[in-house]
Swiss-Prot record:
Disruption phenotype: No visible phenotype. Mice develop normally and display no obvious immune defect. T-cells retain susceptibility to apoptotic stimuli. Pfam families: EF-hand_7 (PF13499). Its main location: endoplasmic reticulum. Mg(2+) binds at D169, D171, D173, W175. PROSITE patterns: EF_HAND_1 (PS00018), EF_HAND_2 (PS50222). Homodimer and heterodimer; heterodimerizes (via the EF-hand 5) with PEF1. Isoform 1 and isoform 2 self-associate; probably forming homodimers. Interacts with CPNE4 (via VWFA domain). Interacts with PDCD6IP; the interaction is calcium-dependent. Interacts with RBM22. Interacts with PLSCR4. Interacts with ANXA7 and TSG101. Interacts with DAPK1. Interacts with SEC31A; the interaction is calcium-dependent and promotes monoubiquitination of SEC31A. Interacts with ANXA11 (via N-terminus); the interaction is calcium-dependent. SUPFAM superfamilies: EF-hand (SSF47473). It is a peripheral membrane protein. Calcium sensor that plays a key role in processes such as endoplasmic reticulum (ER)-Golgi vesicular transport, endosomal biogenesis or membrane repair. Acts as an adapter that bridges unrelated proteins or stabilizes weak protein-protein complexes in response to calcium: calcium-binding triggers exposure of apolar surface, promoting interaction with different sets of proteins thanks to 3 different hydrophobic pockets, leading to translocation to membranes. It comes from Mus musculus. Keywords: Acetylation, Angiogenesis, Apoptosis, Calcium, Cytoplasm, Cytoplasmic vesicle, Endoplasmic reticulum, Endosome, Magnesium, Membrane, Metal-binding, Nucleus, Repeat. One of its GO terms (cellular component) is nucleoplasm. This is Programmed cell death protein 6.
């Protein structure tokens, strides 16, 4: 099961809990075969997107699917083989557990207050104004809430931007030439 390499969660903190055990290999192999529609031995982003559910009866965010595939596709084949799929399975399952933890009203969506709780739990300290920006950016349905797949995508993007910011914040004071939130606001406005 070396396919799953732990990636710290958003903020460098816990993110998806790494504690959940994988189902047995035969179960995962059966799932893999059902998802691998063209029997190529590699699950493409389209195949994975069709297999995933975000709980809203809308297609899983293709950007999220591509991000997840790229994290686990060690051979740059635009998909994941069975070994890599076990990592994808665990990664998504871990994110489901995080999502359910912070979806306090069990609506299947993360609202602004739940998002604040989640990001605070990951170690982020952001303003209400910035939480509004995140909701607007990742709410594909325009309901003021974020679905599961968009929650993953938002956390992935925030983590990547944080990593970039930290590279330039050499004295680790939360400032480069602009404040962290100004930087994120600028980047999110063009992403």
């Amino acid at each position: 099961m070396a396919a799953y390499s732990y990636r710290p969660g958003p903020g460098g903190g816990p993110g998806p809990a790494a504690g959940a055990a994988l189902p047995d290999q035969s179960f995962l192999w059966n799932v893999f075969q059902r998802v691998d529609k063209d029997r190529s031995g590699v699950i493409s982003d389209n195949e994975l997107q069709q297999a995933l559910s975000n709980g809203t009866w809308t297609p899983f965010n293709p950007v999220t699917v591509r991000s997840i595939i790229s994290m686990f596709d060690r051979e740059n084949k635009a998909g994941v083989n069975f070994s890599e799929f076990t990592g994808v399975w665990k990664y998504i399952t871990d994110w489901q557990n995080v999502f359910r933890t912070y979806d306090r009203d069990n609506s299947g969506m993360i609202d602004k207050n739940e998002l604040k709780q989640a990001l605070s739990g990951f170690g982020y300290r952001l303003s209400d104004q910035f939480h509004d920006i995140l909701i607007r950016k990742f709410d594909r349905q325009g309901r003021g809430q974020i679905a599961f797949d968009d929650f993953i995508q938002g956390c992935i993007v925030l983590q990547r931007l944080t990593d970039i910011f930290r590279r330039y914040d050499t004295d680790q004071d939360g400032w480069i030439q602009v404040s962290y939130e100004q930087y994120l606001s600028m980047v999110f406005s063009i992403v």
